[in-house]
Amino acid sequence: LPVNQRTALEQLLFFNVNQHRVRVGIQQSIETYGVPEIHEQDGGLRVRVGDIDGVQTLFAVSDIGRLLGVAVFVRSAHERFAVLHLGVDPRLSMTPELNTRVLLKLMHEIRSTARRTRGVDRIELVYKDRHAVRLHG
């Protein structure tokens, strides 16, 4: 994500008006994995979480370059990815089908990455009481 999108990313991760819907999950993620931080790397923005190595950040960006969503995940055990943080631009909640499409696209990309990663067969959604979804074939 370009550095000039820092404010949009801060709004999405830290000041999202919809955070109250998943407050318990956010607290659980922070207690377990650490606080997310935005940092610059190789001329772009990334999110790191606590002192965990291998945290990956996935951005959903519109055709005109507007940040629509973010997913932060890590390989938490040999066989699973943990989705630590997931956020969508709150303005999209006025258009539920677009909001859902962005969330589904982010999860689809994480699932695709998991399928390409040897040994990973589950995706854990930390916001949903650590619910793990098994990947099939």
Where are these regions (language model features)?
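Short amphipathic alpha-helix that is part of the acyltransferase structural core
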Residues: 1-42
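Contiguous hydrophobic segments
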Residues: 2-18, 56, 117-137
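Serine/threonine-rich low-complexity intrinsically disordered regions
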Residues: 2-4, 18, 48, 62, ...
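Short linear motifs in intrinsically disordered
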Residues: 4, 46-50, 112-114
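A signal for specific C-terminal beta-sheet/loop modules enriched in small/flexible residues
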Residues: 4-11, 58-63, 73, 82-86, ...
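A conserved beta-strand-loop-helix scaffold within acyl/acetyltransferase catalytic domains
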Residues: 27-32, 36-80
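Acyl-donor binding region in acyl/amide transferases
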Residues: 76-136
